[in-house]
């Protein structure tokens, strides 16, 4: 499994450098950086998308990942979910929102589970592998911080911050 993940990451890095790829329009505007020299300034580095969670599909044919872009003026980040066909290296953007979608993983039935702040707090969502059929699975007060399903998807374990007692900040 480690070799598949390493291979997928190397493939993702190689495909990301392909200048012939059609650009996907994000829901936010990424800066159009022009390099005046070969020096990588902080502005140039911040304009790059950062790859987040990576997960290989149960059939080991598709790579699931998210890309985060930072907006300096708004002082916030945007994350969207993508899939890549490992056979041909073509990527497809599944989400395109002004919210963060992250922590994505494949479920045992071939769907994609992920966290999103779309409902006001971070909750668990699920969609089909093609991005259709978006469904909110949790509505936990204050949101969740992580999740994992049992192998048969009959049980869900989620993380949540819980305040135990008052401290000096209260």
For each predicted feature, which ranges?
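A flexible loop/linker signature enriched in serine peptidases of the S9 family
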Residues: 48, 67-80, 95-102, 115-125, ...
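Bacterial signal peptide processing site
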Residues: 18-20
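C-terminal motif of bacterial Sec signal peptides marking the signal peptidase cleavage site
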Residues: 14-16
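Multi-bladed beta-propeller domains
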Residues: 24-50, 73-76, 84-100, 128-143
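Sec-dependent signal peptide recognition
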Residues: 2-8
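Hydrophobic beta-strand positions that form the internal "hydrophobic ladder"
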Residues: 60-64, 94, 110-113, 137, ...
